[in-house]
Amino acid sequence: MVKEPNGVTRTMRRIRRIHFVGIGGAGMCGIAEVLLNLGYEVSGSDLKASAVTERLEKFGAQIFIGHQAENADGADVLVVSSAINRANPEVASALERRIPVVPRAEMLAELMRYRHGIAVAGTHGKTTTTSLIASVFAAGGLDPTFVIGGRLNAAGTNAQLGASRYLVAEADESDASFLHLQPMVAVVTNIDADHMATYGGDFNKLKKTFVEFLHNLPFYGLAVMCVDDPVVREILPQIARPTVTYGLSEDADVRAINIRQEGMRTWFTVLRPEREPLDVSVNMPGLHNVLNSLATIVIATDEGISDEAIVQGLSGFQGVGRRFQVYGELQVEGGSVMLVDDYGHHPREVAAVIKAIRGGWPERRLVMVYQPHRYTRTRDLYEDFVQVLGEANVLLLMEVYPAGEEPIPGADSRQLCHSIRQRGQLDPIYFERDADLAPLVKPLLRAGDILLCQGAGDVGGLAPQLIRNPLFAGKGGKGA
């Protein structure tokens, strides 16, 4: 039987079974899990089994490995990610039988329709900000439903059905699908040149789409915008909705001062209109995470969450999988090396993480293992990648993760190595296979180093492999 939290109208009355094509994806599995918890029958297919599909199976989802037309038999609706096209046999079969096929964001919008939706948009910082909001709301006793693009460490999942009317979710601009959402509160963390193929290579079109997204808010809704970002500041006058700004800038409505970082923990003071200054700390390094915390504080304050709960929720935040996740210590001659895994795959994200490391551990060397994500992104942001990757002390580059793209001449990791080497910043090392990394990197490591594995592709599997590798006799740690 389908059930809804108190005060939430039941939706999708004619729908019983929901089939997800590409159910293992970060944006898909969370929605599937919430629907399972609501009592819907859920099935889904993916190209390979994973911890995600196994988890959904334990919760009652029927999982198919591979895409076959018959997988969708009995479904009342198909949910597809932007990576799935009409030629997919399950989609083609559903269309032939006049079964509705909807994008992932439309299903998320349906979940949000009768809830108090809080949607977090922006090129960078969506997952962490969404996670922080969910954590602070939970600390305030509001028990939100959340759908996040990464695993919330405290909950062990990237989605959860709460008992309240609140739903907190990421709003994805990569395919402009966030335009389906009609939240009560919307955050814009920043706007950067990424996923430009969606916008025909036109940055102005991207900016206009963010403006359109914010105007999906009702006239009594709230836009929460980071004025430290120049593009967000630029579109601010176009937003005809109630707005609160945040940042480090002196003209921000809510701002952070007295910022101090030691290792993983960051302390700062929050200034809010008509409120006493609030001293907070968060167990994450970097100014970018101060900004993510400020967005959370704006929304929590607006929803009436107590300062005590805000401080508790931020201080006790246990992080998100692959967002500066500390795996533990690798044993090397003379001591150990801190092993960190991170999802950052845009030059601005890479720069923010490097800055956080330099700020929290100024005496340590940074040994970086990086995998570019998509040939098009590598091509479009090539000079930015050359500049930022050259800031490591030691750099190992894995081949580009294609994400379904064909190689582009001159936009690969070998060429990046060549360009960085030519500038005399350092001498990068190129490698192709996961198994090559441990013997390559071990002689390069010194006691006290930080080893950062970063990128959005299969580089995400390297840190778990290294911490178990007998070459290092590693002692595992908890994700940060």
Curated annotation (Swiss-Prot):
Alphabetic keyword roster: ATP-binding, Cell cycle, Cell division, Cell shape, Cell wall biogenesis/degradation, Cytoplasm, Ligase, Nucleotide-binding, Peptidoglycan synthesis
Provenance organism: Pseudomonas paraeruginosa (strain DSM 24068 / PA7)
UniProt-listed Pfam families: Mur_ligase, Mur_ligase_C, Mur_ligase_M
GO cellular component term, pick one: cytoplasm
Name of the protein: UDP-N-acetylmuramate--L-alanine ligase
HAMAP family the UniProt entry points to: MurC
Family: Belongs to the MurCDEF family.
EC number: 6.3.2.8
Catalyzed reaction equations: UDP-N-acetyl-alpha-D-muramate + L-alanine + ATP = UDP-N-acetyl-alpha-D-muramoyl-L-alanine + ADP + phosphate + H(+)
Entry-linked PANTHER family: UDP-N-ACETYLMURAMATE--L-ALANINE LIGASE, UDP-N-ACETYLMURAMATE--L-ALANINE LIGASE-RELATED
Biological role stated in the UniProt entry: Cell wall formation.
Pathway the protein acts in: Cell wall biogenesis; peptidoglycan biosynthesis
SUPFAM superfamilies registered for this protein in UniProt: MurCD N-terminal domain, MurD-like peptide ligases, catalytic domain, MurD-like peptide ligases, peptide-binding domain
